[in-house]
């Protein structure tokens, strides 16, 4: 595999991807970031088995391939590189060589086949709302999520689409928070409970800009 990207694009995608890298795990492969250049896009994937993140990185693919690299080591290398073009090349021994100007790093990788891939999402009719709106709805309800994990449902938020409204509900046994917004078109009724940890990370990723939109493709895997 050989890909060429600008440092700024790599760093942006790695920063987002790190939010789905577990701090502790019995599966070392989950500490990795999957770099997939087997198609016409460069994709970074991380997965802690609760939250999975896939980002598309702007760049050029000169040789197709796939590799899993330790996410934190990869981040530290990219962070310290000069603000210029970065080349990532792998060999048959799964060794990755990262070069930028006069800087050169070599780190061992793992087979992409061992990685915990994200589930294939069956795309329903996508719900499109502004990133600002979703970020605000999460912010105004997440404080009522229970911290006690004896009741898993209370550690998440209910997302429900019904009667042309999106409703988000959280409760911890003592208080309840509800936020509703009218949708601009009709959608089929559906609902799902999303873990609070996942929503916290999603909220950090959302830009908070009114003009930026987010497409919710499925309320099974949100």
Tell me what each language-model feature is.
Residues 1-220:
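Structural preference for solvent-exposed beta-strand-turn elements
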